[in-house]
């Protein structure tokens, strides 16, 4: 498999061009990546102090799955989320969720095996599955239904080579939160076809508007599920690189796969130990993220601002996100003659020095969407949307 053929446009060609422009002295307004710290967010003070106090005792390797205190705290968190049949040995820490997704795909997929991944998706899923030799089959999430998965589309794409289904809930890039009824339908499909369920839940503590997050594994005690989460987003420490995955449910149906996971986990020795040392404090302490996602909080108010500002621009529509810090607007391709969304993003970057990610970067099949990160403060978001309005007032792709 040729690595250069794999798309990962969150850090792709448009981002490369922005970096070149910065080297030439231009100031770029970046709305392309969910990295909280550069936008003025920081970890709770007790988390920082806890890491500093543990550095001296964190200089050696840990168990390949992680230190006891971290896994114990994660197990307790899994109990709060009602994940069934979880023991300490079912918990793996990683250098972010990204490392663990890659590990899972390497252990699962042989050449020609198929895996169902949403469209739009977080592109790491498609890239790692393809690099592992699998065939990615994208199922549609329906914008007209609040970006929920299209069950008929899922069913139509299952074959005898389908091994698993991936869900991203809360969703990146759409900000959707799947209700229990939607998750139950996915569980039923997985049950009928004996599919493994992979659930990416890194934004489960960033849910707004009274919505509740349900872990799909809690609805599937008879199925083998792998649930991913971590501290990068909820605790604003993406650079610390600490995530985890939890195996639950019918582990007896996946003994060979679990052996493969254990082998690959041992091969990378362990995840970084200083970051593991803060998990207990982070999960058990004051959850400062709650201040951000309530009315008056930064993420909540910035979400409201970006939604209104974008949908006030002629030719732009959007579904209001309910979680995370992304919005995935639709652009009228006929109005602006857009045939290539990457070219649209490059044109906007060149003319207005604002960096967005085109929809193709999330394996969306039409050139009619782009993702905006609403982590910048309202003043910066206002600047970005004013520039977009000005740009689109005369734009006609050539």
Per-region residue spans from a language model:
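Conserved PLP-anchoring active-site segment centered on the Schiff-base-forming lysine
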Residues: 107-129
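Active-site phosphate-binding strand-loop segment of PLP-dependent enzymes
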Residues: 137, 142-213
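PLP-dependent enzyme catalytic core of the Aspartate aminotransferase-like
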Residues: 80, 155-156, 337-339, 347-356, ...
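Conserved core segment of the aminotransferase class I/II
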Residues: 218-297, 307-309, 392
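Conserved glycine-rich beta-strand-loop-beta hairpin in the small C-terminal domain of fold type I
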Residues: 280, 296-307, 318-332, 366
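N-terminal small-domain helix-loop-helix segment of the aminotransferase-like
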Residues: 4-96, 103, 270, 282-286, ...
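Helix C-cap/helix->beta junction micro-motif
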Residues: 24, 132, 192-193, 223, ...
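A short helix-loop-beta submotif of the ANL/AMP-binding
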Residues: 131-137
């Amino acid at each position: 498999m040729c690595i250069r053929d794999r798309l990962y446009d969150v850090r792709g060609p448009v981002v490369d061009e922005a970096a070149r422009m910065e080297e030439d002295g231009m100031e770029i307004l970046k709305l392309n990546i969910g990295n909280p710290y550069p936008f003025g967010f920081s970890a709770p003070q007790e988390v920082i102090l806890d890491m500093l106090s543990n550095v001296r005792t964190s200089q050696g390797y840990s168990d390949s799955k992680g230190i006891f205190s971290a896994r114990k705290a994660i197990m307790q968190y899994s109990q709060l989320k009602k994940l069934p049949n979880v023991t300490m040995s079912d918990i793996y820490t990683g250098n972010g969720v990204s490392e663990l997704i890659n590990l899972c795909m390497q252990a699962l997929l042989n050449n020609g095996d198929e895996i169902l991944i949403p469209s739009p998706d977080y592109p790491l899923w498609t890239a790692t599955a393809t690099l592992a030799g699998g065939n990615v089959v994208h199922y549609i999430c329906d914008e007209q239904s609040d970006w929920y998965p299209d069950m008929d589309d899922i069913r139509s794409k299952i074959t005898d080579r389908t091994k698993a289904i991936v869900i991203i809930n809360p969703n990146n890039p759409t900000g959707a939160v799947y209700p229990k009824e939607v998750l139950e339908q996915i569980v039923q499909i997985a049950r009928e076809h004996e599919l493994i369920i992979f659930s990416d839940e890194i934004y489960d503590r960033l849910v707004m508007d009274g919505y509740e997050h349900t872990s799909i594994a809690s609805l599937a005690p008879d199925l083998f599920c792998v649930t991913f989460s971590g501290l990068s987003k909820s605790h604003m420490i993406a650079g610390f690189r600490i995530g985890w995955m939890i195996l639950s449910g019918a582990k007896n149906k996946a003994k060979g796969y679990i052996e493969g996971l254990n082998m690959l986990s041992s091969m990378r020795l362990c995840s970084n130990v200083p970051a593991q040392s803060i998990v207990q404090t982070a999960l058990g302490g004051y959850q400062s993220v709650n201040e951000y996602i309530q009315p008056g909080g930064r993420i909540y108010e910035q979400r409201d601002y970006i939604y209104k500002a974008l949908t006030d621009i002629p030719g732009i529509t959007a579904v209001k996100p309910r979680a995370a810090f992304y919005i995935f607007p639709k652009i009228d391709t006929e109005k602006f003659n857009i045939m290539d969304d990457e070219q649209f993003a490059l044109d906007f970057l060149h003319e207005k020095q604002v960096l967005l990610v085109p929809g193709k970067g999330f394996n969306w099949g039409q050139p009619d969407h782009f993702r905006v990160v609403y982590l910048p403060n309202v003043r910066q978001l206002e600047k970005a949307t004013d520039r977009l309005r000005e740009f689109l007032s005369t734009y006609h792709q050539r």
